[in-house]
């Protein structure tokens, strides 16, 4: 038995040695959110409800029409929204528009001034009212005003180019509201492309064509019984919107982040205005004592006791009230003392959402120092410069290229095919701004030129001027001053830079130097 017990014990130990050690029971880790932004508590349930994991088109699709219609309503009835669109018109496009400048070159690489002059003059003619737009209502400047207004308000705008248009250049533009691009049109096509909210795209999400309704959905004068679409190729029509996310097919209003605050501010201000108006009109109330006055409507009472007191008020007069009637002044607290600071804080939020500074959006320069005004002005100008470059890349470069092609085909521009690349380059010059502090900014520009960290041409471009135009104008001024015997104001500047002579025109060859100095 002792032998058997020892054998059993040895067998048991051998089995334990071969088997793996027992693993402890798995314990699931406790997960905690590291980012406060991702935590879900009772205090941010509303935020969680607004979150959405859909793609860009899915998110835009649900609210697209509501966003557009509410933005249009505010553009009509809200002074702050109207101010925002006016600021874009003034600062992005400007009073004279974004100017086209030809950069044609001769075969030797120097500027072809004659060709540049011809191209720019023809474009100016085309830009006049009645030439550039299919309706004949707009000049190119007013067309761009409408374009930037529509882009910011609706979030998207379409421009169609019409080749072989019956004008001198065979070219015109048509601006189209995005209502005609059917948001509900989403399907796959037999050619393998798909339509997302009216935009036909290929497998790489490149726009191929746009499916437009033949009439505006809000046109109450002419609405066909059955809606039909027209397919416009993408090389004829450009849909412009400010991209928010990748894979996005449509845009939405630029005012979306501040529109809700703007709505409440307008409602609050309107209510305060009405309350203040009523308080100014209503000075007080008459109270009747039942012991002295008969009940209104009593047949035995006099006409004067019917509860109606006829008032005729004039300066320096007083009235004796009937017995039992006392006057109780109405103490109106509107507008409240919190009206101004609350409105100011709310408009600051709106300005932060829209883009321009609060001082510009609200027309409020109260308490603004010169240094803070200068800092804010520079930052705000960068905001407009970004939109200027967006307009150039999205629309103007495309318009310039097609206009050049159509003008050459119509024979307006005599450009041989072999010189196309040399004669057709153009540059778009957006509006600039004057210096906020002329003396300091002028000294800084001078220092930049002297230290070779800046150029005269770049300084001129920042002010919205073409350097070639400025140089030619200065040269012409000098010749004109000399011809008319007027002292030359450029003399000191030219002498300081070592310039003592400017080549005169042919008719001035026998006259002394044109700098106005001896």
UniProtKB/Swiss-Prot annotation:
Any Gene Ontology biological process: symbiont genome ejection through host cell envelope, contractile tail mechanism
Major localization class: virion
InterPro entries named in the record: Phage_lambda_portal (IPR006429)
Region of interest (Disordered), ranges: 492-518
Keywords, alphabetical: Capsid protein, DNA-binding, Viral capsid assembly, Viral contractile tail ejection system, Viral genome ejection through host cell envelope, Viral genome packaging, Viral penetration into host cytoplasm, Viral release from host cell, Virion, Virus entry into host cell
Gene Ontology annotations for the cellular component aspect, listed alphabetically: viral capsid
Keyword DNA-binding: yes
Pfam families: Phage_portal_2
Entry annotated with the keyword Methyltransferase: no
Subcellular location: Virion
Function: Forms the portal vertex of the capsid. This portal plays critical roles in head assembly, genome packaging, neck/tail attachment, and genome ejection. The portal protein multimerizes as a single ring-shaped homododecamer arranged around a central channel. Binds to the terminase subunits to form the packaging machine.
Record's subunit section: Homododecamer. Interacts with the terminase complex composed of two small and one large terminase subunits.
Family: Belongs to the siphoviridae portal protein family.
Protein name, per record: Probable portal protein
Organism: Halomonas phage phiHAP-1 (isolate -/Gulf of Mexico/-/2001) (Bacteriophage phiHAP-1)
